[in-house]
Structure formats: C-alpha cells, structure tokens
Amino acid sequence: MNKIFLLSLSTLIFVIGCAGSKPKPVTNKDLPEWYLNPPKFEDKFVGVGDALRPQFSLSKQVATERARVEVARAVETTVNSSLNDHMQASGIGMEAGATEFTESVSKSLVSTTLKGCTIEKTEIFKDRVFVMVTYDAKKAKEEAKVVARELAKKEESLYNEFKARQAFDSLDQAIDRMKGSSSVAKPE
C-alpha cells in the first residue's frame, strides 16, 4: 500500500512539475514604454534593441548593436529579391493535372558607417537590456554627400584612366600604320 501511495505521489509531483514549466508571454509591463513605440524626431533616426545574455556587458553590447542595425536599415538598405513562378500542366483536356509552384526570396543587406550614433536610453527589465540609439539626420545627409563625392571622384579617375589608355592605343595604332619609307634620302 505504501509503495502504491509513494508511486502515485511521485507521479503527481512529476506531472505538476512538468505542467508548470510553460514560458510566460512577454507583456507591455516587461518592456520600457519606448521600446514598442520609439519616439519620432524630425531630425533624428531612432533605433531600439534588446538582448538577454548571461553577462550584463554582453547584453548591453548586443542590444546596442541591434539598435544601431535598426538605424542603419533606416538610413541605407539594399534589398535583393527574387520571385520564381512555375506552372506546369500535363494530361489532355479537362482531365489535365496542373502543378503550380511559387517561391519568393528576399535578403536585405545593410552596410553603412554611423559616425555619431549615440545611446539615448538604456533600461533593464527582468534581466533583459533595452537600448535606444539616435543618429542625427543631418549627419546622415552629410555622410551620404561625402560618399557620393568620393564615388564620383573614383569614377572620374577611372574614366580619365580609360581615356588615357584609349589615347595611347590610338597612338600605337597610328605608329603601326606608318610606312617604313621616308622622303629623306638614304645615306649610301
């Protein structure tokens, strides 16, 4: 009787223990107010990020990096996408079978330099670090102008090099077309 009681009790404890291990859903009380609805500024880009890591410093670093990536996506994002659409039918008339396959793939790549991106807020909620960063829109415009000018100079330099090569090739061809004779009398 004691064995049955102990077995029943241990089974009951096991079932109760397993049933209570569901993760709690995240609620607004677990987040800073500004995380889901970041403030909007006319002259600044805003990005938010969060991280939950064993070490606080790593959490802060990862959350900050995620917030910066969000800003970088707002400043400059290159999106590559492809859509493959395949349709096939086999058989005769209304008895034909049809197969249709559609695949959509997209990838975004962010590569930009954020000079002057600053951390505005850092908060900790239940061991999770939340970070908000801002980036001055005027600085973003200036950086874009600098990059555009550098690209234009590089393209101009490449174009000038191309034109110089063309000129030398033209000169080489003109020399090759020259005849070997001259109107000057040859010395005997």
Q: What annotation goes with each model-predicted range?
A:
Residues M1-A19:
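Sec-dependent bacterial lipoprotein signal peptides
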Residues C18-E188:
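Domain-level marker for long, solvent-exposed, non-transmembrane regions
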